[in-house]
Amino acid sequence: MRNRFVEIPTPDGAMDTFITRSEEGGPFPAVVVFMDIWGVREELFEIARRIGTVGYYCMVPDLYHRQGGIRYEYRDANNRMISLNRLDEARFNEILATRGGLTGAMVVEDTGALIDFIDDGEPASTDAMGSVGY
């Protein structure tokens, strides 16, 4: 598998994006793995890698790029992500405020930037695209 991080230009600045795909072949159907409220993290990169192993070109964009690439990782003693409703009020409100700063229009704009990036010569096809995530 080929894994890399790239900065994809958007009207609001560079968007860090994790990309994974097979070593050989292509063009691959593209799949966008959309992050959840917590932001991008290793678990999402692993989901993308698993999808990539069966012949897809996977992208995990940092949709919080306008806010400085925020990532939340609150874990319990067993290193599992803590549920949002188990956070104290201050952390809970901080995460909701971050998520509230991301609109549907922004996600659509960022998705368009991903498509433009692929169309600029990546070994992927925008003729057949999919998405998973939140």
What are these language model-derived features?
Residues M1-Y134:
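N-terminal cap/leader regions of alpha/beta-hydrolase-fold enzymes
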